Amino acid sequence: HNGVDLICESGLYIKSRTHGMVTKIGYPYDPADEKKGHLRYVEVSFDGNRFRYFYLDPMVQVGDKIVAGDVIGCSQDLTEIYTGITQHFHFEWIGPDGEFVDPTSMFDLL
């Protein structure tokens, strides 16, 4: 499990932690999957780094320039798919070398 899951309510506006450009809007699962195919992610890239925000309805398009703090989407409801799951979005940081970086340094965590 690369990245970090951050607890949130469904429908919460998710803001970019960095500036950059939207380089991908993708599906973490096969879009034909009746159960999970609607789940999406947004990738924001800056200086060779890629930041991925999973399980949100995108409010941006590929090519959009992003400033840190811009809303990029709304969190999707995972409880409809996984009974008993804690509602969350998933955040990943992939460094310029293609390796995953621990993203917790980007958040004020206690």
Where are these regions (language model features)?
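Short proline/glycine- and basic residue-enriched helix-capping loop/turn segments at helix->loop/beta transitions
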Residues: H1
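Short, small/polar residue-rich loop motifs at catalytic or cofactor-binding pockets
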Residues: C8-S10
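Short acidic/polar mixed-charge low-complexity motifs
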Residues: L12, N49-R50, D97-E99
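Short, well-structured beta-strand-loop connectors
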Residues: Y13-I25, V60-D77
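Zn2+-dependent peptidoglycan hydrolase active-site motif and core
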Residues: S16-M59, I81-H90
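Conserved, short, structured surface segments that act as functional micro-motifs
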Residues: E34-H38, D64-L110
